[in-house]
């Protein structure tokens, strides 16, 4: 009997990101090597899903380049729409409301995904293959953008969790409802991301501890 795969993924982002600060600091970048060393000790190769502020942080860049060079981990893409270029003020105060990327127009969504992908690939000189959506907000448009750009794995789905009541833009409809999504890995259907299909994008849902 094969043992189940165990994958470690880390949202690699600024300090206290949810405190609505107007300036995001990245002091935590100085301490990531400790966790990397722990992973290596037990033979794990973590995936550092990297947000904009960390992608331009020199300490993290040096750290991640070393991890990649030694083949001991991977850098992937993670995107929070309110502080990832190009800037587009959706709500009048995006730093306060932290809108979901899927609340933006197709054009703005595309520009932001392209920018982050190119920034990461140019900085780390490696193809971006893995992705997790900021605030777990994922939809069909987003999935098709990832496929177009050659991503192979997404890990945005939180099975049985409904994020509709977690507001982004005040006039929006909240996050993604994953209540009826699979709890196992599957290649997504490009027309309905809650169903298995024939696309090249593998969805690896998160492990969730449910509240009873």
State the predicted function of each range.
Residues 31-35, 112-116, 120, 142:
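Alpha-helical packing segments of well-folded alpha/beta enzyme cores
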Residues 3, 43-44, 125-127, 150:
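Short loop/turn motifs at secondary-structure junctions
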Residues 52-137, 199, 208-210:
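Metal-dependent polysaccharide deacetylase catalytic core of the NodB/CE4 family, i.e.
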Residues 133-212:
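Active-site-adjacent pocket scaffolds in enzyme catalytic domains
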Residues 26-27, 34, 38-40, 69-74, ...:
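A structural signal for the main folded, soluble domain(s) of proteins
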Residues 6-10, 46-48, 75-79, 129-131, ...:
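Hydrophobic faces of well-ordered beta-strands that scaffold small-molecule active sites
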Residues 1-70:
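Active-site beta->alpha N-cap acidic-glycine motif
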């Amino acid at each position: 009997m094969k043992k189940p795969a165990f994958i470690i993924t880390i949202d690699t982002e600024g300090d206290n990101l949810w405190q609505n600060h107007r300036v995001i600091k990245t002091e935590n970048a100085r301490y990531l090597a400790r966790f990397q060393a722990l992973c290596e000790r037990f033979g794990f190769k973590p995936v550092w899903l990297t947000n904009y502020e960390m992608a331009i942080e020199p300490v993290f860049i040096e750290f991640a380049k070393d991890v990649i060079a030694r083949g001991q981990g991977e850098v992937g893409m993670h995107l929070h729409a309110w502080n990832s270029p190009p800037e587009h003020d959706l709500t009048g105060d995006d730093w306060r409301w932290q809108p979901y990327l899927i609340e933006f127009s197709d054009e703005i969504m595309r520009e932001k995904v392209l920018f982050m992908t190119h920034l990461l690939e140019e900085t780390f000189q490696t193809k971006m293959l893995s992705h997790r959506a900021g605030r777990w907000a994922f939809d069909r448009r987003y999935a098709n953008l990832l496929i177009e750009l050659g991503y192979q794995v997404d890990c945005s789905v939180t099975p049985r969790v409904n994020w509709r009541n977690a507001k982004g833009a005040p006039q929006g409809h909240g996050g993604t409802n994953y209540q009826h999504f699979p709890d196992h890995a599957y290649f997504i259907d490009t027309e309905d991301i809650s169903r298995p299909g024939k696309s090249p994008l593998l969805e690896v849902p998160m492990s969730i501890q449910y509240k009873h």
